Amino acid sequence: MTEIAIPRLKLEHIYKSFPGVQAVSDVSLNVYGHQILALVGENGAGKSTLMNIVNGVVPLDSGKIYLDGQLVSIPSPRRALELGITMIHQELALIPELTVGQNIFLGREPRRWGIGVDWKRLYAQAQRELDRLGIEVSAQATIADLSIAQRQLVEIAKALSYNARLIALDEPTSSLTSRETDTLFRLVRSLREEGVALIYISHRLEEVFELADRIAVMRDGHLVAVGNASEFTPAEVVRLMVGRELAEFFPKVPAKRGEPVLKAVNLKAGREVRGVSLELHRGEIVGLAGLVGSGRTNVARLLFGADRLEGGEIWFEGRQVHLRSPQDAIRLGIGLVPEDRKAQGLFAGQSVRYNAGAGLIQRLSRWGFIRFQAVNRIVRELVERLRVRTPHLNQKVRNLSGGNQQKVIIARWLGLNPRVLILDEPTRGVDVGAKAEIHALMSELAAQGMAILMISSELPEILGVSDRILVMREGRIVAELSREEATQDRIMQAATGQL
Amino acid sequence: MLNGNHSSSFISFLRRTSTYLILLVILVWFALLSPEFLTVGNLLTIALQTSLVALVAIGMTLTIITGGIDLSVGSVAALSGALAAGLATRGGLGTYPGLLIGLLTGLGMGFLNGAMIVWGRIPPFVATLASMAIARGLTLVYTQGRPIAGLDKTFTFWGGQGALGIPVPVWVLIVVAFLAYFLLKHTPLGLHIYAVGGGEETTRLAGVNVGLVKFSVYLISGLCAALSGLILTARLWSAQPNIGVGLELDAIAAAVLGGTSLAGGVGGIPGTLAGAFIIGVLSNGLNLLEMPSYNQQVVKGMVFILAVMLDYFIKQRQAKPKGNPAD
Amino acid sequence: MKRSIIYLLLAFVLVLAACTPAAQTATQAPQQGGEITLGLVISTLNNPFFVTLRDGAQKAADAAGVKLIVVDAQDDSAKMTAGIEDLINKKVSALLINPTDSDAVVPAIQKANEAGIPVFTVDRGSNGGTVVSHIASDNVAGGKMAAEFLCKAIGGKGNVVELQGIAGTSAARDRGQGFNEYMSASCKDAKIVAQQTADFNRDKGLKVFENILQAQPEIAGVFAHNDEMILGAIQAAEAAGRTGIVFVGFDAIDDAVQAVKDGKLAATVAQQPALMGQMAVETAVKYLKGEKVDASIPVPLNLVTKDTVK
């Protein structure tokens, strides 16, 4: 970085507005080869729009884009690919029904006799690409059969097969285990060695500081800071992102631990859950840590009646209960905020009112008719209490940011006054400000006497929010740590079996 | 799960072959119960009768793989048959120009469907429901509701006996099925058809002209429907304005029985052919077994549900180890 | 999960097994040489007329000790052809065909001819192929029957109107022929003052008869080639306040039978589908036993009047 290089990508005074929003405002930014630039900002800060402009997904209003010193226009994703610009999206852009090779070469299949696809060549080339990157996946495997991490790596292989000179990665680790994250990081670093320019978008500041050479911070469409990573501290970055000082990352109101509400004894289900016992008390937040795949989500689903129990007992307020379906759990007052909010938690095409009120409808119906006024009143209260940022209750939920979507799901449960709330990765893909709000809300609920079980892959979150931490490994609970004795190291040791 | 590998490979075998196994079971069953069933003559009859549905089902399969559907096929078949027969006879154009116009009619209706879906952004179900009514209406307007007879031998040839004692419609089916198979499995368009059904936006971002892919499948579906209508007209020696009512349902059933997912992205020609033959064999076999027609409909419906459920359960079981996404 | 697959397979087998009882008789029948199996391919069983026809055929088959296989074409010419092909492969002794369409059925009949299976058409005829006999209602006799009744009802004299069906159809031709033959031969004092077509259609019947009412101040009786037209005519007469007209229809549809009960319609000529089915079976059996049968078997009709209606 001592030599003065021509930037791989040079953005000059980029502007872009959507109806009612100035999404990107006067952004000038250089991205160099042999470097990883971390682009951070809260959701809605304009990172995605900026990346979409660079990838030709949306046209810019004004400004100039230079690639290796050449002025270029990028009217389509196709053109971006031709220029060697690729983007790895948060929602993976792979077609699950097709094979790895077919996905990599989609739209530019090698031909035979002019009309046919040369499958042999396609698979050979794809396999060569995968092998080169050290990705242990068969080019003939179907995407649907791969893990999320493998798909992510395939996506990168696909990007590189375009001879990418600039790769943007949008939240690539949000669904990876730490081991998979390591693999990804290795790959990203080796790409840097090869001279690729990388833009890395993430909410996880630890990752940003681990990986990035430079950091660029966006807020409200503006680029508010850019510089070498060593010039920043995490606290500074957060302050720049939210534009205010966050007093406490994870505000935790100490709560009095009450009597036990939910007790699980030796739960068993398949290979994923092999004898889990736990107890939740009123007023406490229990963190459930462990690697992805350790069975955390399965335990949550068993406690919610979503999966069938093969062995063990569940006790609720001193009575043994048989949860045959989520309805049973809901009737008792157990709620689950699922990990995959788009697929399991939200009716994305419906309004905030509908999503927040969906759980109330049954209770607030009389003679088969929904009492809309009552539903409206409660929904409005909840939306205000949870500070859901939405222009109005009829806004489609898919247009809200991740954090606000999560709040809507929590609002739905609060309308039912649950005694136990299980949250599975409640802040995944949620920006820093909203994250703190969700944490504050959890501790407030606990203080009011609710028992909360939170699953999280983010250790700082687990450590900051939980009163008590359970660590799972291979279907069993292998450690129970109090707030005081828990550290990142102890949790990781338990989770990886190095105890 | 000590026998995990063993049982899962058995299940994956079942998954790949369930449609064919069901067809085989039905064939064996009828062969055991009816002495007339397993004769060359009867098997050829089944092939002949099935070819009409199978042709339409091939086009339907392509549309369904892209995540769409074509409800207009039955009406398009009737319209193509009527126009071809009418122009060949009363129009005085002769057989081949008539047949050509019949095929062009199918392409034209396919174009209309494609235009509504790609340019008009109308959901395929709605768009083709509309063209289904339009094509049927045009057929009735053109024929005034009456059959058109008086086709000459060059026309009726297409519904009759062909080389090697195999009926011409069966030959046509073989050729079309082969072409469609090649298209799906060995051409970029085929790959793109699967891709559009698996993820339209992803496909678009990969630089594929998604609109063109969709247009292609509706054009092909229209062409297949027209072929089926022309062959049916040749087989009946007359164009009947009310042929093909409900044909779309048989075609969808054949595709679904053959493992094509209505959600798109999955399916194939061999499966669809097997599905069409399940339907054809059932009709023929139940007639041979002298089952009263009312009961036949019940049995067909039940076999359909059972076959689809069996397929679903086998696939679900196969998918199970990966079913629970993250944890 | 494995268990549910087994249950499904079991259900699958059970459904197939449901076909067996019929099959057992099926496998025996053709093997006992000399047994007669008739195949009846019927245009539709969604119409009570044809259901009754089938019931009549079944009764006659039972009485004659022959087997009858019925295939429903569901008003679909392709299904009809397929059904005929299936029964040819089944090697039935004779085929009774009630075509969906007189042209579309021809190739299938030719296939039966090639297979040496005698073909009989019922109700609707075929425009080609070799057919042993055509069994259908005797529309000429029906027209005569209507004329005879009408003549008597108006006392043998007065002005008479004939509402005709679609020109060129066999029903319109035959019904009109029988009616006019009787009127000119045996009811000479009555005068046919108007003969107009109303296309078998109730609406047209109403409009056409309105005009006739304008032109003809004196009308004693009306005969229409079907009930739809006569019901239209009755409406027109009621609207115009004309009374004392004797109305006679054809087909005995439900509305018309009700009108007979109400006394608005004097009579309607009824086809006898059960008898048609019965005669079809009897004709085929006779032929298969080596007797000679006529090429055209007229099925008698039946007059529905206030006295005969149930």
Which residues make up each language-model segment?
Chain B
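Hydrophobic core segments of alpha-helical transmembrane domains in multi-pass membrane transport
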Residues: T19-L32, G59-M60, R136-G137, V172-L183, ...
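Transmembrane helix-bundle core of multi-pass membrane transporters
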Residues: P124-T187, V213-S216, R235-G244, N295, ...
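Single transmembrane alpha-helix segments in multi-pass membrane proteins
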Residues: V28-G91, M116-R121, A255, G259-I269, ...
